């Protein structure tokens, strides 16, 4: 099936006839569902433009979503043990193209990513998503319940996929021809988990901004808090001052890539001297920092080492520090970090952040419950069955260091003894300059992995379309196109993001808004 069918539209005459048969099939579908461990909650026809009913969705997960296309929506519980279950949804679109896709979660999971379901359904994918086994972005449900933790660690996406595929085969006479995965952040970790643990689940996996080094990422939140101190510390750095620090880092590193565009193309080539911001007696404290504060900045922007001297987690991306200030540099331990230690590592509601030490980080890594770390570089089974892995990470990510994605790529290269040209056959990783966490940012970050980063003004910039073209037509992406949008939604410029290990350099002759004036070197 050609990729152009992703955007095909049914003829008006055929649509009316299809309406009755599609709605009837949906109305009768609940009576046909008989799948082990599945309790159907509802089956409903939803017309394009209709608001998605969320009566049974956890309140913290409710969001305003309008169906992008006509679809049959199935909500259900999937039992995973006698102490755990998943809330799941399957969206089965009228404009079905013979493709199935599973979506992932975010943060500490807890919510079905309905916007991702809607995005995939819009392009004719039968799609499924789960809540990861609990309600809301919290770790409290893991307390004294290892089964719920197992769902979050690895089980939820796989079980949801198994059920989603069965529903797809039941609903559509033709079944499905190809299966895909789409996820970012925690969803990126889940994508890598699938590649490593369930290599036969998908033909193509899109995993973005992945929290795959999960345990050490959690502990990194504590390290950053310790590095920057409490809010009442006389040398505490406010969010406003972090903005000043950010501007100085960009000033020092912007031209390293050859273009003065306000973007650090690749943080690996940035080596800012923070001490240049130390007050000299003629500047005030709102535009400069003290020597003690400079030391804190350098510590916060350095690698996180465990007690044995090994790197647990790489440094924060230069260029993302201003946004990180609202997460990691608040004077309190990052909430997800504190919850993980309280409800998982120590399994003790009385534990508090003041008790954290480097030994705590060591203990957390040794526990690695249900191998939640998705850092296993041996992905030969996925490669050998013909799977394709497309990964991306924003270089302005304030939550998860993009360097971690580079480290994993190198681990795979070493484990498989494979050169980049050999990895290119099945695994391609793209650095997205100016992208924040899974989107946003100051650069050409609209790469089309969801409604937040897709624009109909550039329909070819669509990660699902890119993956379909690679899996089904053998056309692998040489670069990742991304758009920078104006406030009114128009395209300001496009940039061709490089396939790692190459990086972008502005070589002209045009200015930085000309995509052909950049070279991957």
Curated annotation (Swiss-Prot):
InterPro entries: AB_hydrolase_fold, Tannase/feruloyl_esterase. It is an enzyme of class 3 (hydrolase). The keyword Signal applies. One of its GO terms (biological process) is polysaccharide catabolic process. The active site is at 185 (acyl-ester intermediate), 397 (charge relay system), 437 (charge relay system). Disulfide bonds join 26-72, 61-111, 184-438, 253-270, 279-288, 498-520. GO terms for cellular component: extracellular region. Keywords: Calcium, Carbohydrate metabolism, Disulfide bond, Glycoprotein, Hydrolase, Metal-binding, Polysaccharide degradation, Secreted, Serine esterase, Signal, Xylan degradation. The keyword Transcription does not apply. It comes from the Eukaryota. Ca(2+) binds at residues 254, 257, 259, 261, 263. It is found in: Secreted. Residues 1-17 form the signal peptide. Belongs to the tannase family. Involved in degradation of plant cell walls. Hydrolyzes the feruloyl-arabinose ester bond in arabinoxylans as well as the feruloyl-galactose and feruloyl-arabinose ester bonds in pectin. This is Probable feruloyl esterase B. It comes from Aspergillus niger (strain ATCC MYA-4892 / CBS 513.88 / FGSC A1513). The gene is faeB.
């Amino acid at each position: 099936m050609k990729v152009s069918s992703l955007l095909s539209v049914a003829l008006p005459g055929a649509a009316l006839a299809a309406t009755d048969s599609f709605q009837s099939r949906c109305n009768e579908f609940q009576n046909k569902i008989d799948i082990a461990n599945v309790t159907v909650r509802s089956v409903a026809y939803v017309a394009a433009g209709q608001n998605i009913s969320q009566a049974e969705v956890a309140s913290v997960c409710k969001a305003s979503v309008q169906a992008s296309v006509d679809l049959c929506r199935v909500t259900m519980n999937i039992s995973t043990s006698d102490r755990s279950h998943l809330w799941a949804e399957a969206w089965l679109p009228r404009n079905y193209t013979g493709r199935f896709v599973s979506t992932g979660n975010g943060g500490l999971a807890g919510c079905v990513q309905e916007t991702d379901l809607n995005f995939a359904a819009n392009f004719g994918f039968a799609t499924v998503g789960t809540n990861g086994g609990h309600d809301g972005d919290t770790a409290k449900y893991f307390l004294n319940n290892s089964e719920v933790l197992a769902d979050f660690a690895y089980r939820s996406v796989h079980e949801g996929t198994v059920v989603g595929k069965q529903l797809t085969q039941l609903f559509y006479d033709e079944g499905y021809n190809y299966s895909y995965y789409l996820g970012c952040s925690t969803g990126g970790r889940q994508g890598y988990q699938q590649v490593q643990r369930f290599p036969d689940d998908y033909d193509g996996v899109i995993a973005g901004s992945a929290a795959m080094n999960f345990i050490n990422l959690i502990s990194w939140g504590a390290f950053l808090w310790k590095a920057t101190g409490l809010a009442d510390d006389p040398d505490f750095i406010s969010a406003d001052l972090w903005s000043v620090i950010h501007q100085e880092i960009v000033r020092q590193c912007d031209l390293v890539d050859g273009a003065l565009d306000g973007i650090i193309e690749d943080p690996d080539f940035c080596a800012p001297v923070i001490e240049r911001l130390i007050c000299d007696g003629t500047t005030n404290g709102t535009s400069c920092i003290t020597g003690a504060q400079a030391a804190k900045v350098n510590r916060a922007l350095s690698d996180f080492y465990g007690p044995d001297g090994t790197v647990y987690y790489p440094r924060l991306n230069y260029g993302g520090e201003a946004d990180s200030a609202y997460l990691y540099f608040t004077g309190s331990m990052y909430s997800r970090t504190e919850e993980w230690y309280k409800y998982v590592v120590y399994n003790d509601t009385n534990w508090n952040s003041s008790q954290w030490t480097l030994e705590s980080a060591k203990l957390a890594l040794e526990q690695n419950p249900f191998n939640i770390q998705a850092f296993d570089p041996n992905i030969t089974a996925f490669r050998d069955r013909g799977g394709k892995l497309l990964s991306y990470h924003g270089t302005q990510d304030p939550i998860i260091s993009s360097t971690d994605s580079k480290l994993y790529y190198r681990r795979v290269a070493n484990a498989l003894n494979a050169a980049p040209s050999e990895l290119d056959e099945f695994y391609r990783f793209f650095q997205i300059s100016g992208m924040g966490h899974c989107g946003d940012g100051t650069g050409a970050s609209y790469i089309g992995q969801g409604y937040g980063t897709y624009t109909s003004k550039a329909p070819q910039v669509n990660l699902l379309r890119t993956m379909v073209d690679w899996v089904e037509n053998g056309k692998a992406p040489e670069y990742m196109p991304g758009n920078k949008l104006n406030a009114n939604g128009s395209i300001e410029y496009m940039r061709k993001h490089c396939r790692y290990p190459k990086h972008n350099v502005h070589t002209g002759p045009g200015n930085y808004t000309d995509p052909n004036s950049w070279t991957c070197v």
